[in-house]
Amino acid sequence: AKTTPPSVYPLAPGSAAQTNSMVTLGCLVKGYFPEPVTVTWNSGSLSSGVHTFPAVLQSDLYTLSSSVTVPSSPRPSETVTCNVAHPASSTKVDKKIVPRDCGCKPCICTVPEVSSVFIFPPKPKDVLTITLTPKVTCVVVDISKDDPEVQFSWFVDDVEVHTAQTQPREEQFNSTFRSVSELPIMHQDWLNGKEFKCRVNSAAFPAPIEKTISKTKGRPKAPQVYTIPPPKEQMAKDKVSLTCMITDFFPEDITVEWQWNGQPAENYKNTQPIMNTNGSYFVYSKLNVQKSNWEAGNTFTCSVLHEGLHNHHTEKSLSHSPGLQLDETCAEAQDGELDGLWTTITIFISLFLLSVCYSAAVTLFKVKWIFSSVVELKQTLVPEYKNMIGQAP
């Protein structure tokens, strides 16, 4: 998905949203990519009573909201400013909101109609495990105590279904209510890209609100999985970290879990899927364990579920060999090899020098013997030569 700047909507309350002299203002940041955005109020000087809710990804774009509770004022000059920054698109937006008392006359407040309905995909593990039941979830938030119950309708590829399970609405920390409906679905319906629609209706809504979701379109690509043991710098601490790197997969729906000697481990954290420049995704998972448990030789396994994998599952294990430190062992082996090499070189040089000395001594002895023989032969031949000269006529 390409970088998309957010649209920012100021949310002013109606009279029902006010409690005594306090009023809650909101700021909706919609349709941006990628994360993150930052939301502050009055450039950060207003921090009390601020609640910023997690971003929700829908149709490859993010939406989040932030609210602040402030004293109400009939004076329009007293404004509150919502400051939104989206670094990825270099976007900065400031929206002013006037906390007016809607009960006064002749003041008439108009509140923009903003959807409070969200739809969520099934968990990847539920989709890829045949014994589990995947569910698409529809959530309605910020329901007033005086609002009537909401009604949910569900559609699969525009065909209405009646198998959803709707929970009783629950009161939230800010005295509003939340209502949730879950639709159990078939594993293959999600994997095959069917479209799921949630329609919400209430007497408090001017019209029904619809939200639609389906699996990200595109050819699945299996992830590459790598496990990384603790770095030697961590071995001086009581706890060490094991890392699992999962790269080059598509779509982003993935489940990463850890096991310890075949049993589920709990003390791990996963990053959210992060998009590569080629459109694939990668994830890191970190498992913290006691150093003593690592040094005891226990087996730790990184388990990955993704639709691109054969049987949708793969895993990689790692364990510590007692007394083995890779860097130290390599260094010791290298030192041993060097010592052995120098010993071999020394012996070779010594034997070479001895061979040269021996050859030189033998050669010298032979030369001396030959020279002596030649001299002796010469002395024998000279008198005979002289006698032959004297006998000549």
Swiss-Prot record:
Of the GO CC terms on this record, one is: cytoplasm
Per its UniProt record, what Pfam families does this chain match?
Answer: C1-set (PF07654)
Q: What are the start and end residues of every segment in region (CH1)?
A: 1-97
Keyword Lipid metabolism part of the UniProt annotation: no
Q: How does it sit in the membrane?
A: Single-pass membrane protein
Keywords for this protein: Cell membrane, Disulfide bond, Glycoprotein, Immunoglobulin domain, Membrane, Transmembrane, Transmembrane helix
State the residue spans of region: CH2. 111-217
In this protein, the residues bearing a glycan are: N174
Q: What spans does the record annotate as topological domain Cytoplasmic, numbered to this chain?
A: 358-393
Q: Does the keyword Membrane apply?
A: yes
Cellular localisation: Cell membrane
Q: Where is this region: CH3?
A: 218-324
Q: Which domain of life is it from?
A: Eukaryota
Q: Which cysteines are joined by disulfide bonds?
A: C27-C82, C138-C198, C244-C302
Leader sequence range is none
Annotated SMART domains: IGc1
Fetch the InterPro entries from UniProt: Ig-like_dom, Ig-like_dom_sf, Ig-like_fold, Ig_C1-set, Immune_Resp_Modulators
Protein name (database record): Ig gamma-1 chain C region, membrane-bound form
